[in-house]
From Swiss-Prot:
Phosphorylated in a cell-cycle-dependent manner (from the S phase until mitosis). In response to DNA damage, recruited to DNA-repair nuclear foci, as a hypophosphorylated form. This is Replication protein A 32 kDa subunit B. It comes from Arabidopsis thaliana. Residues 70-143 bind DNA. GO terms for molecular function: DNA binding. The gene is RPA2B. Belongs to the replication factor A protein 2 family. The keyword DNA-binding applies. It holds the Pfam family tRNA_anti-codon. GO terms for biological process: DNA recombination; DNA repair; DNA replication. Component of the replication protein A complex (RPA) required for DNA recombination, repair and replication. The activity of RPA is mediated by single-stranded DNA binding and protein interactions. Required fo cell division in meristems. Involved in the maintenance of transcriptional epigenetic gene silencing (TGS) at specific loci (including some transposons) by regulating histone H3 acetylation, 'Lys-4' and 'Lys-9' methylation. One of its GO terms (cellular component) is nucleus. Heterotrimer of RPA1, RPA2 and RPA3 (canonical replication protein A complex). Keywords: DNA damage, DNA recombination, DNA repair, DNA replication, DNA-binding, Nucleus, Phosphoprotein.
């Protein structure tokens, strides 16, 4: 996939994950839908990005949701290194967009050194428009190492679009909305809150009736910030020792969490990392 054009059929041939169906309790009226905080983080295809409506140089909206920060997955088709910035073009098969990554700090420079022409990347950035031309001011970018992530991104884009368009056309209000239990780490929409990504990617069965005891304890442990940022993950022996849970139970919990799409193995089948922010 690195050497040629984006192949949509090939990308969707793999397996992906849908966001969790968990929702949180409604506290707002649906009339506030169009007044979302501009910091809302939305996964978008470049076709969606190009069709987003705008009322100025920094006010964008799509499906009735205000946006400024976007998540994009695509292939770098052009790249130019400058003294204090890197200009590049990302193509995801639905369109392309100019991107710029400013490199003032060492960490920013090292981040861009890991990105090469032809690579598929996942980036976060602010959507801008200047003289009628849209671009993304990137503040985070990394190579895609698991191509299931491409499938997941497109699936999430479709899910978010369908949810927000159905919500916008519905007539659910605060009086008619049915309260639902709050779930840890949930980023799913309420009847008055559009879908937006949060600190983790949520997948099916992550929080259901069977997610109790050891599984939840292990997941919470792997979702700690110190483990989220670790590329190597955590060894099952360390998890068992830290949590004081029998190793056999920890291994069973890890296997179930892996099947649920909540975690994945890293160095080998004994080290695991949460899919949060993967």
């Amino acid at each position: 996939m690195y050497g040629g054009d984006f192949d949509g059929n090939a990308a969707f041939a793999g397996g992906g994950f849908m966001p969790s169906q968990a929702t949180t309790q409604a506290h707002e009226s649906s009339s506030s839908l169009k007044n979302r905080d501009v910091r809302t983080l939305l996964p978008l295809t470049l076709k969606q990005l190009s069709s987003a409506s705008t009322t100025g140089e920094s006010n964008f909206s799509i499906d009735g949701v205000d946006i400024k920060t976007v998540v994009i997955v695509g292939r770098i088709s052009r790249m130019e290194n400058r003294i204090t910035q890197v200009d590049f073009v990302v193509d995801d098969g639905t369109g392309w967009v100019d991107c710029v990554r400013w490199c003032h700090a060492r960490q920013e420079t090292e981040e861009m050194e890991a990105v090469k022409l032809g690579m598929y990347v996942r980036l976060h950035g602010h959507l801008k428009i200047f003289q009628g031309k849209r671009s993304v001011n990137v503040f985070s970018v990394r190579p895609v190492t698991d191509f299931n992530e491409i499938v997941h991104h497109f699936t999430e884009c479709m899910y978010v679009h369908m949810y927000n368009t159905k919500l916008r056309g519905g007539s659910i209000t605060q009086d008619t909305a049915t309260p639902r239990p709050q779930m840890p780490y949930s980023t799913m929409p309420t009847p008055a809150k559009p879908y937006q990504t949060g600190p983790s990617n949520q997948f099916p069965n992550q929080f259901n009736d069977s997610m109790h005891g050891v599984k939840q304890t292990v997941l919470n442990y792997l979702n700690q910030p110190m483990h989220i940022v670790s590329e190597a993950g955590v060894h099952c022996d360390i998890i068992a020792r830290e949590l004081r849970i029998p190793l056999l139970q920890v291994k069973e919990a890890l296997e179930q969490l892996s099947n649920d799409g909540c975690i994945y193995s890293t160095l080998d089948e004994t080290c695991f990392k949460s899919t949060a922010n993967a």
